[in-house]
């Protein structure tokens, strides 16, 4: 179009821009407005009754103009009512002029639910999308929470207000049970630390042998020996508490004190003492080996299982230090040394926790307690309130009777064993009011304890299935696959592993584009 610059007054309307010439001096010119049509006058780029052809993530459909006119505020409704092609292109990702088709790079599953919304006027929640992804899709297509159907609105709002967790107790799908990619990347990052270390390949093999029982046959043998030593240590501790051993050691201790010698040298049975030394030597070997072979010393001391290993050998060495510190101060200090040694020996009970390294159930229990501190706190709060209330009622009803309800603190023990439905029977009410209070305490305990226990059990089931899936993945992988994994991280720096997430994400996006669904011969119409 030829454009002329004319000096004069400019007027602009919706159709065209008209320039009125300025009248020359001395001449009277009648002012008029041009009536010629603009370039788009009477010519629409789309017919108002034309069906809208869309392609969402490879899913092609045709939507009728009547269905879109019912919801003009949605993105497709605004696209249908667009006055120009330029305005329509701002609402979509791409436009095919030849096929007159609009393309959207969005979730195709939500688009099918969107088609159902244009038919019925109600939007239903998709289980395949999390609540936040579903909300983002709904906002993109111009749908608010009012568009949700009544059957899905309450569930959607509840999940949206609930803080997201790394697990879902109601889900048994492989995606929720299988190990997440973060765990695999953490293992690769730990293995990559050996790349620049001295004797890194040998240290890496030894570390996998000690940490992963399914790595090789020597790792399985090492795990069996470790379990046997832990069980032997626990058995020796239990046998040491038998009456015949206690009487024999007490007589030997009295004779040693009378002779002015330390009772610790003759207190233990020789066989049990040798077994204890062997167990301590094995535990010390495990701790020192894991510390020397660990890829990161800081991470070593932050791992709960490693802390348990340290606590299992700590009482023995503390006992030796106490003996060295108090051994030269005379027989009067031997009594204090014996008390200190008894306290340290009580810490040997923590050796049973070493089995958690070889037990799926114990590791799952630890993960459950770690993620259930709120539920455990609620359970303790419920029990504390119930015990306080029913203890006061029982004290009021039984204080005149000589049955053990003399004070309210004395009634706390009865309230605890009653609410937890243990019922030792050492203290029981005898009056009618006391028995009614006991009945209410027992029934209240059943109801109160059952509420958080269900949530904790669901979490335990989830973590147990997840741990079993991780062990199965390691067990099913053969030795050659482990060799490939080890060789793949040789020379790989930790920084490259941190940036690998972005590269893998781009690769997955490219794969999704290359695996787009095939085009149907004729798109369906709605």
Swiss-Prot record:
Intramembrane region spans per record: 409-420, 421-428
GO cellular component: membrane; perinuclear region of cytoplasm; plasma membrane; voltage-gated potassium channel complex
Biased composition (Polar residues): 496-507
Transmembrane segments: 218-239, 271-293, 305-322, 338-358, 374-395, 436-464
UniProt cross-references to InterPro entries, sorted A to Z: BTB/POZ_dom, Ion_trans_dom, K_chnl_volt-dep_Kv, K_chnl_volt-dep_Kv5/Kv9, SKP1/BTB/POZ_sf, T1-type_BTB, VG_K_chnl, Volt_channel_dom_sf
Region (Disordered): 492-526
One Gene Ontology term of the molecular function aspect: voltage-gated potassium channel activity
Record's subcellular location: Cell membrane
Its membrane topology: Multi-pass membrane protein
Residue spans, topological domain Cytoplasmic: 1-217, 294-304, 359-373, 465-526
GO biological process: action potential; potassium ion transmembrane transport; potassium ion transport; protein homooligomerization; regulation of potassium ion transmembrane transport
Residue ranges that the UniProt entry lists as topological domain Extracellular: 240-270, 323-337, 396-408, 429-435
Motif Selectivity filter per UniProt: ranges: 421-426
Keyword Nucleus: no
Keywords, alphabetical: Cell membrane, Ion channel, Ion transport, Membrane, Potassium, Potassium channel, Potassium transport, Transmembrane, Transmembrane helix, Transport, Voltage-gated channel
Described function: Potassium channel regulatory subunit that modulate the delayed rectifier voltage-gated potassium channel activity of KCNB1 and KCNB2 by altering their kinetics, expression levels, and shifting the half-inactivation potential to more polarized values. While it does not form functional channels on its own, it can form functional heterotetrameric channels with KCNB1 and KCNB2. Each regulatory subunit has unique regulatory properties that can lead to extensive inhibition, significant changes in kinetics, and/or substantial shifts in the voltage dependencies of the inactivation process.
Family the UniProt entry places it in: Belongs to the potassium channel family. S (TC 1.A.1.2) subfamily. Kv9.1/KCNS1 sub-subfamily.
Quaternary structure note: Heterotetramer with KCNB1. Heterotetramer with KCNB2. Does not form homomultimers.
Domain notes: The transmembrane segment S4 functions as a voltage-sensor and is characterized by a series of positively charged amino acids at every third position. Channel opening and closing is effected by a conformation change that affects the position and orientation of the voltage-sensor paddle formed by S3 and S4 within the membrane. A transmembrane electric field that is positive inside would push the positively charged S4 segment outwards, thereby opening the pore, while a field that is negative inside would pull the S4 segment inwards and close the pore.
Name the record gives this protein: Delayed-rectifier potassium channel regulatory subunit KCNS1
Organism (species): Gorilla gorilla gorilla (Western lowland gorilla)
